[in-house]
Amino acid sequence: MNTKVQSAMENLMLNTDDAYFPAGWHEEEVTSISDDDVQVMNEDGTPKTRTGDDGTVYYYRNVRTQAAMVTLDYDGNVIAMVGGLGEKTKSLSLNRAYGVTRQTGSTIKPIGAYALGIEYGLVNWSTMLNNSPLYLKQDMVIRDEDYCRRNGLMGLTDKQLKAYPNAWRSWPRNYGGNYGDGSDLPLWNGLARSLNTIAIRVGDLVGANNIFNFVYNTLQLSTLDPVNDVGLAQMVMGSQTHGVTPMALAAAFQIFYDGEYTTPHLYTRVLDRDGNIYLENNATSYQALTSDTAYVMNRLLKNVLYSSVGTASGRYPKSNGMEAFGKTGTASDEKDLWFVGGTPYYVTAVWWGYDAPYDMTKTLTKQQAKTRTCVMAWKALMEQAQADLPYKAFPASSGVVERRYCTQSGLLAGSSCPSTAVGYYRADDLPDTCTYSHGASTQAADPAAPAEEAPSQTVIPTDTSNLDTD
């Protein structure tokens, strides 16, 4: 570990006066109380309890949000790691950075659908994709769980449910509940804004099986479920059975440096007192993506921070002019909030939520939950960690070129295109040149502005009420 970065992370995660992570206290029902719990008491001073039908006595404790943070370098070395908020009081306490899995939300989009879409040559920087649901209500693919509950239809099979047109809904929705405006958007814009309607179309092109195989086997996200997580909802929207750990997610984002993946490790070797090797690190390194795809993805994820439309717009670290990339993520019902960010030196994953998953908007306002707490904590850490480091750039790939594209067609700009912007493309997979007869100019947002094999069958979880994540 790097003592400077570890110290900075520990100080940040003390979270003095809830500086980064609001508490969001709420009552939690448990079957036993420990000395460390903040027990809920009645007005008369007696413990608040409830007795179940089977005689079980339930107690209540006040719990607050927790957080975890882990930083790696691009050789897989664990630079710093903190597994919880506040002062550490136990040597073997729960470490949420490597010992607890969480649903990824949208942080899985770039490492799966988008990366493979670029790698396979299915999409590029400016591929136009429709901002609308993949499945419409009339397709009768996705159940409307709320409607089914209200009308006593939960026990019906899909075949039986076909008799109830209102028992279905369009899918996916974007974060906030909208279904998109039906316009065509360039891929970079959909990724920067974390639009589910755009990501799901890329995922449908790549295929859920291909995405799962890549993130499970190549990126070693081994806590994903090989049976229940092979579907677009899980592989694009991040609604997995168990999810992944912050350390595993940080390791997966290593690939946006130069395409290489290295298993994370805490040591290189351990020697005994005589200098003999007692333990040797068995980390493995290999090329997960081509360097060309990695650099295109790096530029795409830069937009999350540097574009005026990015979900973390303007929240990049001020570190001697060094660039950064990142991805926000929110799991179902605001139960898990994420940010994974990279600089030329480090890649970091930050998680914020409750130990027992709970809708954070029930204890915090939606604005509080969406103030990008995780990205601001990452920004503060990187500004400290990189304060004295010399300038370093991400490695550009010789197989990637900058080209102007037509903002109306997404093709390379032709002589008659009235509105153009700059994109990054693999030199061996350039779009055609636009020859369309254009109407009125429509300028896309400037990305530089500061501030599956054949598509596989979608596997839909039994409960589809929480499939729309950020």
Tell me the role of every PLM-derived stretch:
Residues 1, 7, 221-222, 234-238:
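Non-catalytic, structured segments within soluble enzyme domains
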Residues 78, 104-118, 125, 198-199, ...:
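Extended, hydrophobic alpha-helical segments in both membrane/secreted and soluble proteins
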Residues 206-224:
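Short, charged, amphipathic alpha-helices and their helix-cap/turn boundaries
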Residues 454-470:
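Long, low-complexity, intrinsically disordered segments
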Residues 2-61, 65-71, 78-83, 87-100, ...:
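A penicillin-recognizing enzyme superfamily signal
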Residues 73, 88, 118-127, 222-226, ...:
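Secondary-structure transition/capping motifs at alpha-helix termini
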Residues 92-97, 230-236:
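Surface-exposed aromatic
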Residues 122-211, 232, 273-303:
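Conserved catalytic neighborhood of penicillin-recognizing serine enzymes
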